[in-house]
């Protein structure tokens, strides 16, 4: 068994074992592996992150993009002194900026650790517990659904059809008396 490369949906290459008849994931891929042998191989855990655009999927556009004007506003005719307004703006902006950085420095890595563990557990449970339970339930419910279907067609359908025929001949005439 020799090593080969596997290309994921983003175009990154990963090493996979290749057998003479192809690997178990992509049969007969030895020729393909030789074609892409010269390309660079990426590890899924060392992908580059963008330090400029830190919200590429725009998760927080509406939630935390809060500026001074979004929080504090003076209506026309009710204005404080210009110096107070400028100092308030500067104080708000700088305090928000540095306090966020302080909180990020203190709690960012522990929170990332907690959320990483949480989503790892969630992924593990989904892959190894939830999906197999659902598949098992769907397989088991098929025989019950067949029995239920036979019961409904045998007993319930004739009963409700008869009741429907009984009530289908009822006519109601509404007359308004003056």
Swiss-Prot record:
Residues 2-94 are annotated as: Required for homooligomerization. Residues 131-142, 167-178 are annotated as: Interacts with SPRY1, SPRY2, SPRY3 and SPRY4. The modification Phosphoserine is found at residues 2, 9. Residues 105-125 dip into the membrane without crossing it. GO terms for cellular component: caveola; cytoplasmic vesicle; endosome; Golgi apparatus; Golgi membrane; membrane raft; perinuclear region of cytoplasm. One of its GO terms (molecular function) is transmembrane transporter binding. Residues 82-94 are annotated as: Interaction with CAVIN3. The modification N-acetylserine is found at residue 2. PROSITE patterns: CAVEOLIN. A lipid is attached at residues 133, 143, 156 (S-palmitoyl cysteine). Homooligomer. Interacts with GLIPR2. Interacts with NOSTRIN. Interacts with SNAP25 and STX1A. Interacts (via the N-terminus) with DPP4; the interaction is direct. Interacts with CTNNB1, CDH1 and JUP. Interacts with PACSIN2; this interaction induces membrane tubulation. Interacts with SLC7A9. Interacts with BMX and BTK. Interacts with TGFBR1. Interacts with CAVIN3 (via leucine-zipper domain) in a cholesterol-sensitive manner. Interacts with CAVIN1. Interacts with EHD2 in a cholesterol-dependent manner. This is Caveolin-1. It comes from Felis catus.
């Amino acid at each position: 068994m020799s090593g080969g490369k596997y290309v994921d949906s983003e175009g990154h290459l990963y090493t996979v074992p290749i057998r003479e008849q192809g690997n178990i994931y992509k049969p007969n891929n030895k020729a393909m592996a030789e074609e892409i042998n010269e390309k660079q191989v990426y590890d899924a855990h060392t992908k580059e992150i963008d330090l400029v655009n830190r919200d590429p999927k725009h998760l927080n556009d509406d939630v935390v993009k809060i500026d001074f004007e979004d929080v504090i506003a003076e209506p026309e005719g009710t204005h404080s002194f210009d110096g107070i307004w400028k100092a308030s703006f500067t104080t708000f902006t700088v305090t928000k900026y540095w306090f966020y950085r302080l909180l990020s420095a203190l709690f960012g890595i522990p929170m990332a650790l907690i959320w990483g563990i949480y989503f790892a557990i969630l992924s593990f449970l989904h892959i190894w517990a939830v999906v197999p339970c659902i598949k098992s339930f769907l397989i088991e419910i098929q025989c019950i659904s067949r029995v239920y279907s036979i019961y409904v067609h045998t007993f319930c359908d004739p009963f409700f059809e008869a009741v429907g025929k009984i009530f289908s001949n009822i006519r109601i005439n509404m007359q308004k008396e003056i």
